[in-house]
């Protein structure tokens, strides 16, 4: 039994071995066949890649050859062009060289010819000079013989005759010199006159300014007729306080739609006009409020004057200038002379003077500065009541202005001789600006002078603080200092002022003199919590 099992096991084992061998052989054949297939595929792919690479290389070689041929052709074409251009340039240079050589030969021939001619002329001149020397010697000898012969028959010596001849020549030369001087002076005057006309014509042609006329009244519209009573106030206190502090007349239209402010002093009227506008807009109109607003407007107006002056200085390119002078320049906007605005007139003079000075070779900037400041004193005349020339000189000297400016202020009214081109330009420009037709009117200026004269008379008395000419000169309101004038002195001062007006003025009519003395006390109460 056991041997039979062993026999079966051996058979099975042999069968397994045979099967394994068969499987091994089959798998080997399979793998071999697969390897051969892979090798064949790889070989085919390698051959394909080799073929593609070979084709690519051949294509690149063909492209490179084509590119090389193309570049070779371009090079040959470019070389041909350059060679052609070079040949043309070379031919042109050879032509120029030939022309230059021909020109040099011609010049050389011409110079040789000129040299020969000059040599001939030199020889001729040498010959003529020798002949002249001989002739001169002969003439001197003949002159000496003639002089000796003449002296033998005359009573004068040689020196006396020479002196007589020289005196006669001197007289003739003096007469000729006088005639020449007179002729040149006449020609110079005529030429100077023509030149001055030309300069003035060019200056006026290049300048065009604005012109303003004087208006002695300002009209302000009222929101409604109720404001008439509010402006007048209880028992007229508001309007009296307004007149007292501003020095301006105030009247109402018949339909109570507007009020009219009038004063010969335009700056004073402008401050009053702004004050009444603010009061009407605010609605609170009472004496204390009027005084407060008036002082605030006056301070603001001074700032506006400085701004106006700075604008003028900047417009005329004058450089630096003291603030006081700028304020006075701005204030000239509210000053009229013979109906002509002082600031506009001064700007005209400055611009014209600059143009004229430039034509005459002077300092344009300095001429403009002298032109804008030549009437600066007019901004102070209504307050200080003196001649505007002296006032202008004082304020300009105080701020160390250039002597040319001082000379222009004096010279434009004939107080000094003209010392410079710039000063002469200012005087000419002033005459042009003031002398044009319609520039000035005398009636307004005479009225302003009459009003100013009344105020100046009152201000001459001791104790007088302010004086306002009102009602077109029919009333003079005088405010005295309460700490210097007593109540019993007020009528005396009023009578003295009235008498002085009667003696000093020559106008027909009556002037009412109203003297006001006021005591005002102010204290402060401290509230405790």
From Swiss-Prot:
<comment type="similarity">
    <text>Belongs to the RNase Y family.</text>
</comment>
<dbReference type="InterPro" id="IPR004087">
    <property type="entry name" value="KH_dom"/>
</dbReference>
<keyword id="KW-0812">Transmembrane</keyword>
<dbReference type="Pfam" id="PF00013">
    <property type="entry name" value="KH_1"/>
</dbReference>
<dbReference type="InterPro" id="IPR006675">
    <property type="entry name" value="HDIG_dom"/>
</dbReference>
<keyword id="KW-0540">Nuclease</keyword>
<keyword id="KW-1003">Cell membrane</keyword>
<feature type="domain" description="HD">
    <location>
        <begin position="342"/>
        <end position="435"/>
    </location>
</feature>
<keyword id="KW-0472">Membrane</keyword>
<feature type="transmembrane region" description="Helical">
    <location>
        <begin position="4"/>
        <end position="24"/>
    </location>
</feature>
<dbReference type="GO" id="GO:0005886">
    <property type="term" value="C:plasma membrane"/>
</dbReference>
<dbReference type="InterPro" id="IPR036612">
    <property type="entry name" value="KH_dom_type_1_sf"/>
</dbReference>
<dbReference type="GO" id="GO:0003723">
    <property type="term" value="F:RNA binding"/>
</dbReference>
<keyword id="KW-0694">RNA-binding</keyword>
<dbReference type="InterPro" id="IPR004088">
    <property type="entry name" value="KH_dom_type_1"/>
</dbReference>
<protein>
    <recommendedName>
        <fullName>Ribonuclease Y</fullName>
        <ecNumber>3.1.-.-</ecNumber>
    </recommendedName>
</protein>
<dbReference type="InterPro" id="IPR003607">
    <property type="entry name" value="HD/PDEase_dom"/>
</dbReference>
<dbReference type="InterPro" id="IPR006674">
    <property type="entry name" value="HD_domain"/>
</dbReference>
<dbReference type="InterPro" id="IPR017705">
    <property type="entry name" value="Ribonuclease_Y"/>
</dbReference>
<keyword id="KW-0255">Endonuclease</keyword>
<dbReference type="InterPro" id="IPR022711">
    <property type="entry name" value="RNase_Y_N"/>
</dbReference>
<dbReference type="GO" id="GO:0004521">
    <property type="term" value="F:RNA endonuclease activity"/>
</dbReference>
<dbReference type="Pfam" id="PF12072">
    <property type="entry name" value="RNase_Y_N"/>
</dbReference>
<feature type="domain" description="KH">
    <location>
        <begin position="216"/>
        <end position="297"/>
    </location>
</feature>
<keyword id="KW-1133">Transmembrane helix</keyword>
<dbReference type="GO" id="GO:0006402">
    <property type="term" value="P:mRNA catabolic process"/>
</dbReference>
<keyword id="KW-0378">Hydrolase</keyword>
<dbReference type="Pfam" id="PF01966">
    <property type="entry name" value="HD"/>
</dbReference>
<comment type="function">
    <text>Endoribonuclease that initiates mRNA decay.</text>
</comment>
């Amino acid at each position: 039994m056991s041997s039979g099992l062993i026999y079966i096991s051996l058979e099975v084992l042999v069968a397994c071995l045979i099967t394994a061998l068969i499987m091994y052989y089959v798998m080997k054949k399979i793998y071999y066949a697969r390897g051969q297939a892979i090798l064949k595929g790889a070989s085919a792919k390698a051959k394909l890649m080799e073929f593609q690479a070979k084709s690519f290389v051949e294509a690149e070689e063909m492209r490179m050859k084509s590119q090389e041929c193309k570049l070779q052709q371009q090079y040959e074409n470019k070389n041909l062009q350059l060679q052609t251009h070079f040949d043309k340039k070379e031919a042109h240079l050879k032509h120029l060289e030939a022309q230059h050589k021909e020109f040099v030969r011609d010049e050389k021939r011409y110079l040789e010819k000129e040299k020969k001619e000059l040599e001939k002329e030199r020889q001729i001149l040498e010959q003529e000079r020798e002949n002249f020397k001989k002739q001169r010697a002969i003439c001197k000898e003949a002159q000496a013989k003639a002089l000796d012969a003449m002296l033998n028959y005359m009573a004068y010596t040689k020196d006396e005759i020479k002196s007589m001849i020289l005196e006669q020549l001197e007289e003739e030369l003096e007469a000729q010199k006088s005639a020449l001087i007179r002729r040149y002076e006449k020609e110079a005057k005529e030429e100077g006159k023509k030149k001055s006309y030309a300069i003035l014509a060019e200056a006026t042609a290049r300048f065009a300014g604005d012109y303003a006329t004087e208006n002695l009244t300002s009209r302000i519209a009222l929101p409604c007729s109720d404001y008439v009573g509010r402006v007048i106030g209880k028992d007229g206190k508001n309007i009296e306080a307004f007149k007292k502090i501003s020095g301006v007349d105030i009247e109402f239209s018949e339909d109570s739609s507007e009020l009219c402010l009038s004063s010969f002093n335009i700056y004073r009227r402008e401050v009053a006009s702004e004050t009444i506008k603010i009061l009407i807009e605010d609605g609170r109109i009472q004496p204390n409020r009027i005084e407060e607003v008036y002082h605030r407007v006056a301070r603001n107006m001074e700032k506006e004057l400085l701004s106006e002056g700075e604008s003028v200085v900047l417009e005329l390119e004058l450089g630096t200038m003291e603030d006081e002078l700028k304020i006075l320049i701005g204030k000239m906007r509210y000053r009229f002379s013979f109906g002509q605005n002082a600031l506009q007139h001064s700007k005209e003079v400055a611009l014209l003077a600059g143009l004229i000075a430039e034509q005459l070779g002077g300092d344009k900037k300095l001429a403009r500065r002298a032109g804008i400041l030549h009437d600066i004193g007019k901004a102070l005349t209504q307050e200080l009541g003196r001649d505007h020339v002296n006032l202008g000189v004082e304020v300009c000297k105080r701020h160390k202005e250039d002597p040319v400016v001082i000379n222009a202020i004096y010279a434009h009214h004939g107080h000094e001789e003209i010392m410079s081109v710039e000063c002469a330009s200012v005087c000419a420009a002033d005459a042009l600006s003031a002398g044009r037709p319609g520039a000035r009117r005398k009636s307004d200026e005479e009225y302003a002078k009459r009003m100013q004269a009344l105020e100046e008379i009152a201000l001459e008395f001791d104790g007088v603080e302010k004086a306002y000419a009102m009602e077109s000169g029919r009333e003079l309101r005088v405010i005295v200092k309460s700490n210097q004038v007593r109540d019993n002195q007020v009528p005396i001062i009023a009578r003295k002022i009235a008498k002085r007006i009667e003696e000093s003025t020559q106008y027909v009519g009556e002037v009412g003199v109203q003297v006001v003395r006021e005591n005002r006390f102010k204290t402060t109460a401290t509230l405790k919590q």
